[in-house]
Regions:
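Hydrophobic/aromatic-rich alpha-helical bundle segments in the mid-to-C-terminal region
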Residues: 119-125, 129, 143-191, 198-210
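Residues in soluble alpha-helical coiled-coils and helical-bundle/repeat scaffolds
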Residues: 52-56, 78-81, 98-99, 115, ...
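Short coil/turn segments at alpha/beta junctions that flank glycine-rich nucleotide-binding fingerprints
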Residues: 25-29, 80, 145
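Short, basic, alpha-helical segments at the C-terminal edge of helix-turn-helix-like DNA-binding modules
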Residues: 63-68
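Hydrophobic alpha-helical connector segments
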Residues: 60, 71-104, 156-160, 184, ...
Length: 210
């Protein structure tokens, strides 16, 4: 890669980072090219050079966000041998962390635009298929290990993904009855409802000391 290409890639990354922050803060409809340029500390011309439209900016922002996330997710779960540990970690990383979770607010914008724009819909389908595939692989791994009691990993993944999405949407919107621990509890209950109960570790008695 030449120096010019390296500089270009760095500028593009800055624009994407600024756009992702602003979309999460204000929503796509409420940001302007000048807002992104100001946040990225560069000229509006640089922003439009890399991203001619806000739709293009949104698609690239969600793609970068999800690719970074899925790479991290795959690296982490591959190091876990226990199927329940893999699934629990996947849920922890995938689900919303707090109200107005930036990653989930970004997805709100993608869903809204995907309903009307075929280009955004295509990107959404691509990213959703990849993340669903990771979940399916985790469930299939647990089934093959004799731990998860399902004959249909694809359906189990679809059902569990629907629960993760549903409660994450509620938490992102600030539902008063839901916090992060409750979200994780609900996801764990859904997983066990479809995959079997997770064994409870035996309690080891402690020796009394005098």
């Amino acid at each position: 890669m030449t120096k010019r290409q390296t500089r270009g890639a760095a500028r593009e990354k800055l624009v994407l980072g600024a756009a992702t922050e602003l979309i999460a803060e204000r929503g796509l409809a409420n940001i302007r090219v000048t807002d992104v340029a100001e946040r990225a500390k560069m000229s509006p011309g640089h922003v439009t050079y890399y991203f001619p439209s806000k739709t293009e900016l949104l698609m690239r922002a969600i793609r970068q966000s999800e690719e970074t996330f899925t790479d991290q997710l795959e690296d982490e779960i591959q190091g876990l041998a226990d199927p329940w540990d893999r699934l629990s970690r996947l849920i922890e990383l995938s689900a919303a962390k707090r109200p107005r979770d930036p990653g989930w607010v970004l997805w709100f914008e993608v869903w809204a635009n995907a309903a009307l724009d075929p280009q955004v819909a295509k990107v959404h389908e691509e990213l959703d298929t990849r993340s669903r595939g990771i979940l399916t692989d985790v469930i299939r791994y647990g089934r093959d290990q004799g731990v998860f009691t399902t004959d249909d990993p694809e359906t189990a993944a679809a059902l569990l993904a629907a629960v993760i999405d549903g409660v994450s949407i509620q938490l992102t919107l600030g539902a008063p009855h839901l916090d992060r621990p409750e979200l994780l509890r609900l996801c764990a209950e859904a997983a066990q409802a479809h995959l079997g109960r997770r064994p409870v570790p035996p309690v080891t008695a402690r020796r009394r000391t005098r």
